[in-house]
Amino acid sequence: MGYRYLNADWVAMMSQDDRELLQDLYNLFAEQCGRLSEFLAQIPKNPPVDSQAANALADLLHKTRGSASSLGILHIPDAMRALEAEVRSGAAWDSVESTLRTLHSQLSEALGEFRSYIEAQDGR
């Protein structure tokens, strides 16, 4: 099965070395994605978003990017790095929100791929 975001070879190698660590990383990544979902749900209907919220988002993007990279997720960490830079530079909120919603969708897909991969490995 081909994956869009999951580097299955990397995950297979890691799961042989430390299955528990892999599960912990997945749980952390899922938690951070959940926090991004909460952030999206709280976005005010009429921006601007205050600088404290923007900084919190940038920090969350940074942490989630690190988790995604640790899990061998492809493509998304680069997009997260770019969005984090946009947020930190004070880019127009409409652009940030649009990119964040797209990225959130990709993160959800990556989580699903990872979960499917792990379940398939457990079923062997």
Question: What residues fall within each predicted segment?
Answer:
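Two-component system phosphorelay core
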Residues: 1-124
